[in-house]
Amino acid sequence: MTRTNLDFLTETDPAIAGLLQQELQRQQDHLELIASENFTSAAVLAAQGSVLTNKYAEGLPGKRYYGGCEYIDKVEQLAIDRAKDLFQAAHANVQPHSGAQANFAVFLALLQPGDTIMGMDLSHGGHLTHGSPVNVSGKWFRVVHYGVDPVTEQLDYEKIRQLAHQHRPKLIICGYSAYPRIIQFDQFRAIADEVGAYLLADMAHIAGLVATGHHPSPIPVCDVVTTTTHKTLRGPRGGLILTRDPELGKKLDKAVFPGNQGGPLEHVIAAKAVAFGEALRPEFKTYSAQVIKNAQALSQQLQQRGFKIVSNGTDNHLLLVDLRSIGMTGKLADQLVSEVNITANKNTVPFDPESPFVTSGLRLGSAAMTTRGMGTPEFIEIANIIADRLLNPEDLAIVQECRQRVAQLCDRFPLYPHLSRVPVLS
């Protein structure tokens, strides 16, 4: 019988092995609706848990500061080539440890402290690294935030243009953590050109949709594109920088190393290469299309049950439920769905009167459960489970019924069954 990494871990450190097994069971037994999460393939898990974790490899393929990198170079070059092929980019750096590290490398390459940047307000769907005052991006740079239209709850490109002309930013950031609609990257390009700004697209949430043509690509029009490699791309947790400009790519490489990182995580880079290879296959395009269909089914059914959806729907993998329509906070809704084994997250909605610790919204995503094989009928049922729970917060019978319905869905669409034979350790 082939032994797994978990077998070895069980012998050496049963405490950690037991916790890993409990986390595995949590993932198997819950409906994962956090929009930024997904499930990697077993092949990605295998690459990340490989002997490549033993090797230091500062530098780039063919230009290392350590010996013994002949195979590491081939692994990283494969990741680079596959990323370029997947996104039709002229240059790729696969070394950023995260999306935040990728963004910071771009700032280091293009900006000086005190420069002006423009990004979406966090409460409207932006990200911490786009100028939030609690992040280094908000401390080192002068930040101008834009938001969505109060009526449509979608980007107001004319208002963004006016802000850009008023403040003349050095860098404009587009791409978000909680925006459910198509981003018109060409309109951002026109605005950036009018004011002489660099244009950065952070496509962390939609990278898998971009790769398969289900969302317009920022590569042809943006100066730099960053992304995480998990979320809709379904790879390991990590970052990636892409550009259509090879000369700018050299500058970005230096901003990653030695600019803000040391040794790259080559075991993670190998896992990225595997994920990029998977994303190049026809079945991944089918998967991405289903991700959108499932999110739209979830959104439409929740609307049928009386919930308000921010921007009245979704074009991608995520949706925001505005809980003010039922007089509930995001914090409470998060707690209520958690009690029936549904994992989601409270989230601010545009013009939210509540604090970020309470919020008026619930963010939901379809990527992870689509990976498990669920389709639109299952997502309609998920919407009904959520609605039944939130509309009956005090009904204990509903709690038990919803848990059973969640369990039935999870049993029909198993996750990592090959890992399930290891017993839970006390």
Swiss-Prot record:
**What are the recorded Gene Ontology BP terms?**
glycine biosynthetic process from serine; tetrahydrofolate interconversion
What cofactor does this protein call for? pyridoxal 5'-phosphate
Q: Where in the cell?
A: Cytoplasm
Which residues carry the site feature described as Plays an important role in substrate specificity?
Answer: H230
Q: Which residues form the signal peptide?
A: none
Q: Which UniProt keywords apply?
A: Amino-acid biosynthesis, Cytoplasm, One-carbon metabolism, Pyridoxal phosphate, Transferase
The UniProt record lists the EC number as 2.1.2.1
Query: Disulphide bridges in this chain?
Result: none
Q: In which pathway does it act?
A: One-carbon metabolism; tetrahydrofolate interconversion; Amino-acid biosynthesis; glycine biosynthesis; glycine from L-serine: step 1/1
InterPro entries membership: PyrdxlP-dep_Trfase, PyrdxlP-dep_Trfase_major, PyrdxlP-dep_Trfase_small, Ser_HO-MeTrfase, Ser_HO-MeTrfase-like, Ser_HO-MeTrfase_PLP_BS, SHMT-like_dom
Family annotation (Pfam families): SHMT
Give the GO cellular component terms, alphabetically.
cytosol
Database matches in Gene3D superfamilies:
Aspartate Aminotransferase, domain 1 (3.90.1150.10), Type I PLP-dependent aspartate aminotransferase-like (Major domain) (3.40.640.10)
Q: Which residues carry this modification: N6-(pyridoxal phosphate)lysine?
A: K231
Reaction(s) this enzyme catalyzes, per UniProt? (6R)-5,10-methylene-5,6,7,8-tetrahydrofolate + glycine + H2O = (6S)-5,6,7,8-tetrahydrofolate + L-serine
UniProt GO MF annotations: glycine hydroxymethyltransferase activity; pyridoxal phosphate binding
Domain of life where this protein originates: Bacteria
Keyword Lipid metabolism attributed: no
**Positions of (6S)-5,6,7,8-tetrahydrofolate binding:** L122, G126, H127, L128, E247, S355, P356, F357
Could you tell me what this protein does? Catalyzes the reversible interconversion of serine and glycine with tetrahydrofolate (THF) serving as the one-carbon carrier. This reaction serves as the major source of one-carbon groups required for the biosynthesis of purines, thymidylate, methionine, and other important biomolecules. Also exhibits THF-independent aldolase activity toward beta-hydroxyamino acids, producing glycine and aldehydes, via a retro-aldol mechanism.
Subunit details: Homodimer.
Could you say which protein family the record assigns here?
Answer: Belongs to the SHMT family.
Put simply, this protein is called Serine hydroxymethyltransferase
The organism encoding this protein is Cyanothece sp. (strain PCC 7425 / ATCC 29141)
What gene is this protein translated from?
glyA
